[in-house]
């Protein structure tokens, strides 16, 4: 029996850019859909990591003991806004569960506390976000700009975010697996 493609646009879905999407930051991006409603959608890019130097006034990097912190470009909108994706379920009043064991939210004191803990939770510190107006994401999906997959802790906090796009396509199997081998520069094909 053939696998039925995942086709549900909802919180906890992963959006994978079609290989022919050549839209700068969205090229080969994997986006965790954090909210999807009739009013619009927003998500965070998981596979575009950043090498950042952050002011000690904002985040005292010298006190970071948790090696599980990754800096990501969440998207092109409001790039100065910081959002936390993490695996800490202990502060439910400040966070929203996006998929099992993956949470969005928390404040600066929470971040500083878990960053100084050697055995802290997994954290994606995302700068900016990706957003769509009402109906826009649905149109892009129907136009073939995005493929969908269910999100998981393993995908969100993978050790190799640079390979996440092709890893998920391979896991989806079938035609998606063959798309995972398409070169970034289609002229090289």
Curated annotation (Swiss-Prot):
One Pfam match, given by its short name, reads DUF179
Which InterPro entries did the record assign? AlgH-like
Look up the coiled coil feature and give its residue ranges: none
The UniProt entry, under Gene3D superfamilies, shows:
VC0467-like (3.40.1740.10)
Q: What's in the GO CC field?
A: cytosol
Q: Which PANTHER family match?
A: UNCHARACTERIZED PROTEIN YQGE, UPF0301 PROTEIN YQGE
Q: Which family does it belong to?
A: Belongs to the UPF0301 (AlgH) family.
Please state what the protein is called. Answer: UPF0301 protein CAB604
Species this chain originates from? Chlamydia abortus (strain DSM 27085 / S26/3)
Its lineage reads: Bacteria, Pseudomonadati, Chlamydiota, Chlamydiia, Chlamydiales
């Amino acid at each position: 029996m053939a696998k039925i493609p995942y086709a549900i646009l909802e919180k906890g879905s992963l959006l994978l850019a079609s290989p022919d999407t050549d839209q700068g930051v969205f090229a080969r991006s994997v986006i965790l859909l954090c909210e999807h409603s009739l009013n619009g959608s927003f998500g965070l890019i998981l596979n575009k990591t950043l090498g950042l130097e952050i002011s000690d006034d904002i985040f005292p990097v010298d006190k970071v003991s948790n090696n599980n912190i990754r800096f990501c470009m969440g998207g092109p909108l409001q790039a100065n806004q910081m959002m936390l994706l993490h695996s800490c379920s202990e502060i439910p009043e400040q966070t929203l569960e996006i998929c099992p064991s993956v949470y969005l939210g928390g404040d600066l004191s929470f971040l500083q506390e878990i960053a100084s803990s050697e055995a802290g939770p997994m954290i994606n510190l995302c700068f900016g976000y990706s957003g769509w107006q009402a109906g826009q994401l649905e149109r892009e999906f129907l136009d073939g700009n995005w493929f969908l997959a269910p999100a998981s802790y393993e995908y969100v906090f993978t050790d190799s975010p640079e390979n996440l796009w092709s890893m998920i396509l391979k896991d989806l199997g079938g035609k998606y697996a063959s798309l995972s081998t398409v070169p970034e520069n289609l002229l090289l094909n």
